[in-house]
Amino acid sequence: MNRLLSLIIITASAFSHLNAQRVIYSEFDREDVRQTNFEIIGRYNSNVLVYKNLRNRNTISIYNADMKETQRVEIDYMPDRMTNVDFIAYPTYSWMIYQYQRKSVVYCVAAKIGPEGKKIGEPIQLDTTDISYSSSNKLYNFIYSEDKQQLMILKVNNKNEKKYMFKTLLFDKDLNMLKISRVILPMTDRNDILTEFSLDNEGHLIFGHGDRASNDQNILKFNLVQKQAQADTFSIKPINLDNITLDEVKIKADNSNGRYVLTSFYYKGKKNTIDGIFHSEWNKATDTEANNLAIPLNDDIRAEARGENNLRNAFNDYYLQQIVLRKDGGFVITAENLYTTNRGSANPFNRWNYFGSPYMNASDYYYYGGTGWGYPYNRWGNSVTRYNADNIVVMSFDKDGKLQWNNVIHKSQFDDDGEATISYTTVNTGDAVRFLYNDFEKRDPILALQSIASDGQIIRNPTLKNLGQGHTFLPRYARQTGQKQVIVPCQYRGFLTFAKIDF
């Protein structure tokens, strides 16, 4: 009797969990055509704020708990010629960092946005730059620490390919100035590259500097570069590469354990076949490399992950996507199989500038990264390129960098219009990490959900309720707005809408 009662309780709990998964859509507005640039700012109380830009019009839409648009706030203080907008959200307000060009001057300005989408106080000018040309690309990079207490804008003048001139401006969370620095980074060759920039909780800037033989080859030498919060110099720390070369390097500050974690796919020598995962740790206290591992990918995981490739080339189309740090010092990485197929004679594929590669080289004067907002359609400008996003590999490592488990989420996606509908997003609900992506098995893509538990087991969740109403999801641009809530942009009859998913 007790066992039967327990079974009933467990079953009821399971059905309750399934019923809790629901999707609520916003109504489409004819002003929100699919070319609209947007940024999901975050949730304030039960409202969700979304920034929108179309040509020279900038607004913030307020959606209530039922995803009804209750207000659209005009941002009339933003000028024309906008080149980039970034947001950082706090519990009671957010900062909007925007860039624009007027004549020959680029401005970087901050506006404080309240929960109702209206500005608090007057915009703050953070920096300006004189340039001699007209540009639609962003000039400044905006980064912030994990705890959001340290904020930085920075720009790089690489007109002199032997000496990159950095200007960094460090602020606290209220945008009080903490430090302005101008620092020169020596460069050895025009094929040198810089990785994405990161900021740790102490305000230290970190990034990577790689040396390549040519523009499309592997990294032969690699340095971790650090600028301490109050320093005016770079500290350059060589990373040991023992007869291997590297692919794209991801660097993350492990603030809980006082270290920097570096991860990359590696190749043996100068070959073009990915052999495994490279892992390095830099200890902040001792200022030394604390761990350095080259972890081969065995045949079992290659067989599971390979897709259309043979065993040896199983990972040649994979790109590292995320490093998720655990408090115990371990970490999880995800990698996705991304490639293009070309139906014409020209092939635009280049691994080093593909799918939003963060790298900057000497051809990018005053420029780093992309526009930073919206979503792309048909990047190559022709209809002969098909974008593909297939399997996701998830690997868990302990604090010493030893592989604990790995698993593969199988999917097959393609899009001829760009990258908007393919790839995935993750939602960390505490009990598991959920992967949301479009399933292309049927004629129209439908949103699928799979979860990975802490022991690496994959759980294929039932189809979410309230799907199939003509909405095409764009999961790669989603934003988690609560422990078990995510806002996902959608296309509906050629218009931009949004869906709220509660788990």
Give, region by region, the residue ranges found by the protein language model:
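Short beta-strand elements that form the blades of beta-propeller/WD-repeat-like
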Residues: 39-55, 87, 91-104, 141, ...
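Beta-propeller blade signature
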Residues: 108-116, 165-176, 219-232, 275-288, ...
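Conserved blade-ending motifs and adjacent loop-strand segments that build the rim/top face
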Residues: 238-250, 291-319, 406-424, 455-483
